[in-house]
Amino acid sequence: MLPSWTIGLLLLATVRGKEICYEPFGCFSDEKPWTGILQRPLKLFPWSPEDIDAHFLLYTNENPNNYQRINITDLATVRASNFQLDRKTRFVIHGFIDDGDSGWPTDLCKKMFKVEKVNCICVDWEHGAWTKYTQAVHNTRVVGAEIAFFIQGLSTELGYGPENVHLIGHSLGAQLAAEAGRRLGGQVGRITGLDPAQPCFEGTPEEVRLDPSDAMFVDVIHTDSASIIPFLSLGIRQKVGHLDFYPNGGKEMPGCQKNILSTIIDINGIWQGIQDFVACSHLRSYKYYSSSILNPDGFLGYPCASYEEFQEGGCFPCPAGGCPKMGHYADQFQGKTSAVGQTFFLNTGSSGNFTSWRYRVSVTLAGTKKVRGSIRIALYGSNGNSKQYQIFKGSLQPNASHTHDIDVDLNVGKVQKVKFLWNNNVINLFWPKLGASRVTVQGGEDRTEYNFCSNDTMRENALQTLYPC
């Protein structure tokens, strides 16, 4: 992938005509800002709809496993299908060197059917996506125009308004969705950008890339947003939505540091393994979204100016107005989806369903002597127990307090007790004892505080249990 577009961007191109038209989808210019700018020096036209050969594959709750193919220029195929006018319609759009008739797009539809009645349309434009990157960039314009034409037809012929439509696009698919939204004057109900493509889009004018004006609500998940040079990142860095989420800082995702062999020999197959090695962080965006459908509370985004401030605890807990949920339910952030450029940060798990719940833990120490070591806390709640998390490492002094935010991989529910452990891994002939006299735990979402107390002190590596004060 990378050599084709990086080398291609350096090539000189022959000046061509100013536009090409593909009826009934409109005309496409090869003038600025579409080409001839710093990010797009090549003059290219998009391929024709016939060459791209995009397919629109409808899945519904009535046919979750076998699609019904829709002809977007013949709405009789919609009337003859399981498409329901009283349901929301979500389009799922893949990106570069991907396809839409299997894999994550169809899996996304199936998860939606578990929580809602919905028309789910996978847009398979693989013929236009499996080519040189710069050509695929321009091909998105035609597929975007096709989607816009289809949505407009649903509105004029079936009375199905564009506000009922949600476009979900990964990588180039997100920029493709933006083109559809732009052509509809921003009347689409929602666009979700899953790590929108960076090359040929970062820093371009608004009409070229995803922008808040493309839909009534635009939410974005950034997972591979470091700079192209030297990191070869694929996702856009700039804020391009109403709500922009940067999980784990938005640059490198946990669990994406595996070695080459273990990644390529992936349990999901060789091709999936190769994709995960080349673009692991880039792919996490749709994996997070997919998991959020069934785990809505495990992806809470905290409003913050930077990831560094978030990590230092400066943006905890959620403000009085609450925090949005990254992913499928981001539009439930009531009354706060119209302001543009809002940034949110969170940490995720490294595997499994990637969920995480943030807690602030404060520990006040008890004992008679100062020692060096580390202290750890485990939470025990109505929904389950957490593993032990390190709160502090260094000089442990009686009566000193230490506070740290932890990201727990399950929602423990109402915290009922905590367990404290300390160690220094050094032989000490005096067998010092240390304990926690008070532990305070605060949940990030509801801001509830739980207080636990004890008069005990323990030798190292011995668990101390604290109960509500």
UniProtKB/Swiss-Prot annotation:
Keywords: Calcium, Cell projection, Cytoplasmic vesicle, Disulfide bond, Glycoprotein, Hydrolase, Lipid degradation, Lipid metabolism, Membrane, Metal-binding, Secreted, Signal. Glycans are attached at residues 71, 353, 399, 455. The active site is at residues 171, 195, 282. Ca(2+) binds at residues 206, 209, 211, 214. Transmembrane segments: none annotated. GO terms for biological process: cholesterol homeostasis; fatty acid biosynthetic process; galactolipid catabolic process; high-density lipoprotein particle remodeling; phospholipid catabolic process; phospholipid metabolic process; triglyceride catabolic process. Residues 357-469 form the PLAT domain. It is found in: Secreted; Zymogen granule membrane; Cell projection, Neuron projection. Its EC number is 3.1.1.26, 3.1.1.3. It catalyses: a triacylglycerol + H2O = a diacylglycerol + a fatty acid + H(+); a 1,2-diacyl-3-O-(beta-D-galactosyl)-sn-glycerol + 2 H2O = 3-beta-D-galactosyl-sn-glycerol + 2 a fatty acid + 2 H(+); 1,2,3-tri-(9Z-octadecenoyl)-glycerol + H2O = di-(9Z)-octadecenoylglycerol + (9Z)-octadecenoate + H(+); di-(9Z)-octadecenoylglycerol + H2O = (9Z-octadecenoyl)-glycerol + (9Z)-octadecenoate + H(+). It holds the Pfam family PLAT. Disulfide bonds join 21-27, 109-120, 256-280, 304-315, 318-323, 453-469. Residues 1-17 form the signal peptide. One of its GO terms (molecular function) is phospholipase activity. GO terms for cellular component: extracellular space; neuron projection; zymogen granule membrane. Pathway: Glycerolipid metabolism; triacylglycerol degradation; Glycolipid metabolism. It comes from the Eukaryota. Lipase that primarily hydrolyzes triglycerides and galactosylglycerides. In neonates, may play a major role in pancreatic digestion of dietary fats such as milk fat globules enriched in long-chain triglycerides. Hydrolyzes short-, medium- and long-chain fatty acyls in triglycerides without apparent positional specificity. Can completely deacylate triacylglycerols. When the liver matures and bile salt synthesis increases, likely functions mainly as a galactolipase and monoacylglycerol lipase. This is Pancreatic lipase-related protein 2. It comes from Bos taurus.
